[in-house]
Swiss-Prot record:
Function field: Cell wall formation.
Keyword Disulfide bond on entry: no
Protein's name in the database: D-alanine--D-alanine ligase
Record's keyword terms, sorted: ATP-binding, Cell shape, Cell wall biogenesis/degradation, Cytoplasm, Ligase, Magnesium, Manganese, Metal-binding, Nucleotide-binding, Peptidoglycan synthesis
Any single Gene Ontology cellular-component annotation: cytoplasm
SUPFAM superfamilies given in the database record: Glutathione synthetase ATP-binding domain-like, PreATP-grasp domain
Species this chain originates from: Methylobacterium radiotolerans (strain ATCC 27329 / DSM 1819 / JCM 2831 / NBRC 15690 / NCIMB 10815 / 0-1)
InterPro entries (alphabetical): ATP-grasp, ATP_grasp_subdomain_1, D-Ala_lig_Van_CS, D_ala_D_ala, Dala_Dala_lig_C, Dala_Dala_lig_N, PreATP-grasp_dom_sf
Family annotation (PROSITE patterns): ATP_GRASP, DALA_DALA_LIGASE_1, DALA_DALA_LIGASE_2
Top-level EC class: ligase
Residues noted as binding ATP in the record, renumbered to the chain: 127-182
Amino acid sequence: MSKHVAVLLGGTSAEREVSLNSGKACADALEGEGYRVTRVDVGPDIASVLTALRPDAAFNALHGPDGEDGTIQGLLEILKIPYTHSGVLASALAMNKERAKTVMRAAGVDVPEGRIVNRREAARTHPLPPPYVVKPIAEGSSVGVIIVRDGRSHPPQILASEEWTFGEQVLAEPYIAGRELTCGVMGDKALGVIEVKAATGDWYDYDAKYAPGGSVHVLPAELKPNVYQRVQELSLTAHQALGCRGVSRADLRYDDTPGGTGLLVVLEVNTQPGMTQTSLVPEMAAHAGLSFGELVRWMVEDASLNR
């Protein structure tokens, strides 16, 4: 009998649409690989739904709070349902950007400097000299990220408004010029390195990530061999330091601008990277010789408890 896999998708976070797309792609691919699949749009009744289903494994295609912060992982541990991706602690750590930086820094991974400030304080006075970046402590997909350009006289006022729904504390970091790099990790191996370029502008924001034609992916990234290898080493070290399992993706900045610092830093580790057939990790896996179906099959067969 084929293995029964519950694909967890949707949810209620700001990344719901991304999760629906990831979940559909993974569910379709798993059916193509011969698994019996149930698509589960996650809501408040998720515990009773999974208790009734009793799947052999859960494929976690959720993004954002509740899906990649240790919450759903803890529930799956309680229900004794093996699941994909990282466990409770690694998920919670990686979702909190400042705490993740503390752990990565202790493991020798270069990360940006920065400080946590109250959002209203950051709307009154610049928390850092411009240019700098303000971001929610626990969101993904560039949701809520603001770049404050050099020469801007006033801090971003949206931080003091009711429109800001991403928490009272924000993370401010110096803006690092240069290139946006990303590297996936699968098990104990780093995949290829992609340079991501926004089709318009100089920032890889939510629209650049998900709108058709919003970005250009250069794979393999055109880097000196030693830099390429260093990106892979940093990504794998960050994955291991945070205790990640299965598949993750590290996002980095590399300042190779004329007269620049040469700085190479890990911005964050995504424990639930996008999983459509055109997402970054599947693209890296394909470059390494793995089809999308083979990738999701590996993830299901890697599923376990106590991750």
